[in-house]
Structures are given as structure tokens and as C-alpha cells.
Amino acid sequence: MSKLTKNQKLALGKIEAGKAYTLKEASALVKEITTTKFDASVDVDVRLGVDPRKANQMVRGVVSLPHGTGKQVRVLALCTPDKEAEATAAGADYVGLDEYINKIKGGWTDIDVIITMPSIMGKIGALGRVLGPRGLMPNPKSGTVTNEIGNAVKEVKQGKIDFKVDKSGIVHTSVGKVSFTPEQIRDNAKEFISTLIKLKPTAAKGAYIKSIYLSSTMSAGIKIDPKSVEEN
């Protein structure tokens, strides 16, 4: 394990051991403890009281972050020719069909999100081996299989993200950048956590939100008091 730098030690010292911070406090503190020279991502990790191996306890959904993610999201719109102008106008980085299907078959995955139409899913099913492991397979539940191509592209570009619980019962997502104001970080994190709470499966027993941590790339995690999420 590499030694901590002087700045990292100072940053770590700002987190009080064992303390659960309010979301408001944590959103300001995460900026103070970040020592990277680049604009680091701000991440939220929520441990849920669910058993993801059971279909009736799977948690997945979408959320539109009020201040976006701060990331440049590369969008591929796989659509019929009559929808190409709509997708391009909405801001899709790549627009087409057979040309891009062939590129993906050849291993090309230099994109973050694929948006497509129900009528085309038959062609895209064959790409599952390439897209599935990378989390790129379009899904009606996340709004990436739709006839409203333009709207879907705009939403993704503006900060709509999809998430799902992993096999350990944790949901992890990025809610912005360190360059965001504490208020923007808090608003985004609050929207994400509130959405998670609404998605609680009826089959889940006991405490649903077990823990919440806020961190930035390479920073320590800041424990958050779940009760503080809805506070103003």
C-alpha cells in the first residue's frame, strides 16, 4: 500500500472518526478533503437492506440529477433514418444503425450510453456479448429503448442516470464533480437518495437504508446520517 501524502493526511484528519455527518455538512466537507489536481467525481455509495439475489428485492431505476453529472456523456443513437435528424438535433454524438452495429461487433465501445428504438432491438440482441459486460445494453426500464429518441438523448445529456444494486447490496453512482458548489452536490445526492427510498421493494425486511457514504475520487468516505437527507 502506498504511503499517504501530506495533503492526504491533512484531509483524512478533517473527518471525525465515527461521526455521521448531515448531507449538508458532507457536501461541503468532500470538497475540503479532495487533494487531486483534476476535477474529481463526487460519488455516493448506499448500502441497502435487500437480498439482490431475489428478483423481488432487486432495486434499479433512473434519476435526473438537477445539476447534471458534470461529465461529458457520449451518446450513440441507433435509429431508423427518419429519426436521425431528431437524434442529431438533440445532441447525440453518434447517429446511425448498421454501420455502428458492425463497429460494435468489431469491439468498438467508445461510448457511455446507447439509445435505440423497440423496432431495432432484434438487431441489437446479437450485441449482448459485447455490450452486456460493459453495462451498455439498452433497456426499456432505463428509458434507453424508446420511440422518443430526441427526448431520451436530451435527458441523458442533461444528467439522467440509471443505477442498480450490486450483488453486495450496494448502489454506487456519481452525483457530480468537486468543482460543483456544496449546494449542487447536496441537491444531486438528495435527489438520488430520495429516488432510492421510493424504490424500496415490498419484500425488503428490516432497515432499508443501512449506510450512506459520500466521497470523491481517491478520497476517504464521509458517513452520512440517513435522517439528514430530507432536511433543508
UniProtKB/Swiss-Prot annotation:
One of its GO terms (biological process) is translation. Pfam families: Ribosomal_L1. PROSITE patterns: RIBOSOMAL_L1 (PS01199). InterPro entries: Ribosom_uL1_bac-type, Ribosomal_uL1, Ribosomal_uL1-like, Ribosomal_uL1/biogenesis, Ribosomal_uL1_3-a/b-sand, Ribosomal_uL1_CS. The keyword Transmembrane does not apply. The keyword Signal does not apply. One of its GO terms (cellular component) is large ribosomal subunit. Signal peptide: none annotated. Gene3D superfamilies: 3.30.190.20, 3.40.50.790. One of its GO terms (molecular function) is structural constituent of ribosome. Keywords: Repressor, Ribonucleoprotein, Ribosomal protein, RNA-binding, rRNA-binding, Translation regulation, tRNA-binding. It comes from the Bacteria. NCBIfam families: rplA_bact. Belongs to the universal ribosomal protein uL1 family. Part of the 50S ribosomal subunit. Binds directly to 23S rRNA. The L1 stalk is quite mobile in the ribosome, and is involved in E site tRNA release. Protein L1 is also a translational repressor protein, it controls the translation of the L11 operon by binding to its mRNA. This is Large ribosomal subunit protein uL1. It comes from Parabacteroides distasonis (strain ATCC 8503 / DSM 20701 / CIP 104284 / JCM 5825 / NCTC 11152).
